[in-house]
């Protein structure tokens, strides 16, 4: 009987306690590690709190009107013939219009400022990385360094990264939440993405578009190094790798669908491999 008496309080306590359980969740998007992700978080916050300017007053007025004009409230004047108020009309039309205009201008500017193809202004020489999505793994090609990796991306801190992306299979989506923009990749097409990491650390990237049975394991590691010296020492090690990727036969073997792929490094790359993959899909020769 005692339990039944306090049942509602116990349930409320358990419900509120669930909030503290999310303390262990990863809040990647709200804790960015790159300039683009920081700007996107700012856009999210501005849009969210601007819309609260409408939502909060509406909730407040709903509660206020219910209490003030309830049937049992005899202290207020009953005026059934009331039908219009210039002040109310001004508020309920004017404020939403102002907010919509503000969000329109703000969104338009933000979309252009954060265009994935827009180069990042920096005094540091950018690094080019070609990305090919395969079933179910990511191939990262460093064309200037003549190396490639499977499911491993290493970049120096505060260095603009120019990604050229395509798919060697079905349509997919490339996303590193800590650094910013998600972008779709399609076979036979090339798209661009510019990112930069402003904090050291190891982050996760993944496919955010369903692409088959191995989709859930199509993830890769992103390591942000402290300087270019460490990066180029790593490059020299990979250039000595025993695994080669200097022919289309080797690429086609790599492209065979496989799940839960381990990190792998390649040296001695086929010249212009990225463009050849696109050309093969389009059935043209280079």
UniProtKB/Swiss-Prot annotation:
PROSITE patterns: COX2_CUA (PS50857), COX2_TM (PS50999). It is a multi-pass membrane protein. Keywords: Cell membrane, Electron transport, Lipoprotein, Membrane, Oxidoreductase, Palmitate, Respiratory chain, Signal, Transmembrane, Transmembrane helix, Transport. It is found in: Cell membrane. CDD domains: CuRO_UO_II. Its main location: membrane. A lipid is attached at residue 25 (S-diacylglycerol cysteine). The chain crosses the membrane at residues 45-67, 86-108. Residues 68-85 are cytoplasmic. Heterooctamer of two A chains, two B chains, two C chains and two D chains. Cytochrome bo(3) ubiquinol terminal oxidase is the component of the aerobic respiratory chain of E.coli that predominates when cells are grown at high aeration. Has proton pump activity across the membrane in addition to electron transfer, pumping 2 protons/electron. This is Cytochrome bo(3) ubiquinol oxidase subunit 2. It comes from Buchnera aphidicola subsp. Baizongia pistaciae (strain Bp). The gene is cyoA.
